[in-house]
């Protein structure tokens, strides 16, 4: 199991990055909540990882904080929630927002996330309710500052933001509408994604 990577960021294309660790480039998928805090391309970063082994691929998922990975691991244990859906959940909400939604049984909030219908949302409530109460504060609710968002190398931030939302499970038409609502001159793709996700909840 690869649990942690430290190296130089050589590519950033939401929701994916490539990190060079001693000459080996690892492709890593990150939730947008973690992607926002990445430093610039060319700078060093440390990410916590979870390796998913499938018949057709080995997928590496990365997280800025341990508590994000802890929640990811809880989510993929839930029946009907795969790694891609867990990534979409963590992109739409912070760990504390998700925990509050589950503890307060806010079904409507959960069903706004792409890929989560009423049945899946109900299953999440049943299987995860109460789990957050016994978890150590440091595991789930560690406060951390988000670094300044840095523009990624892109021809059109709006197109890049739209593609990232599609990669997270949104339909193309919905992603285009979401970006159109928040698009403004000078905004980076990461800012547009953040605003679009915030507006959708």
From Swiss-Prot:
Region (Flexible linker), start-end ranges: 144-154
Xref: InterPro entries: DNA_helicase_Holl-junc_RuvA_I, Hlx-hairpin-Hlx_DNA-bd_motif, NA-bd_OB-fold, RuvA, RuvA_2-like, RuvA_C, RuvA_C_sf
Family annotation (CDD domains): UBA_RuvA_C
Region named Domain II: 65-143
Record Pfam families: HHH_5, RuvA_C, RuvA_N
Gene Ontology BP annotations: DNA recombination; DNA repair
Region (Domain III): 154-201
Example of a GO MF term: four-way junction helicase activity
NCBIfam families named among the record's database cross-references: ruvA
Protein's job: The RuvA-RuvB-RuvC complex processes Holliday junction (HJ) DNA during genetic recombination and DNA repair, while the RuvA-RuvB complex plays an important role in the rescue of blocked DNA replication forks via replication fork reversal (RFR). RuvA specifically binds to HJ cruciform DNA, conferring on it an open structure. The RuvB hexamer acts as an ATP-dependent pump, pulling dsDNA into and through the RuvAB complex. HJ branch migration allows RuvC to scan DNA until it finds its consensus sequence, where it cleaves and resolves the cruciform DNA.
Subunit: Homotetramer. Forms an RuvA(8)-RuvB(12)-Holliday junction (HJ) complex. HJ DNA is sandwiched between 2 RuvA tetramers; dsDNA enters through RuvA and exits via RuvB. An RuvB hexamer assembles on each DNA strand where it exits the tetramer. Each RuvB hexamer is contacted by two RuvA subunits (via domain III) on 2 adjacent RuvB subunits; this complex drives branch migration. In the full resolvosome a probable DNA-RuvA(4)-RuvB(12)-RuvC(2) complex forms which resolves the HJ.
Name of this chain's protein: Holliday junction branch migration complex subunit RuvA
UniProt source species: Actinobacillus pleuropneumoniae serotype 5b (strain L20)
The organism's taxonomic lineage, starting at the top: Bacteria, Pseudomonadati, Pseudomonadota, Gammaproteobacteria, Pasteurellales
Recorded name of the encoding gene: ruvA
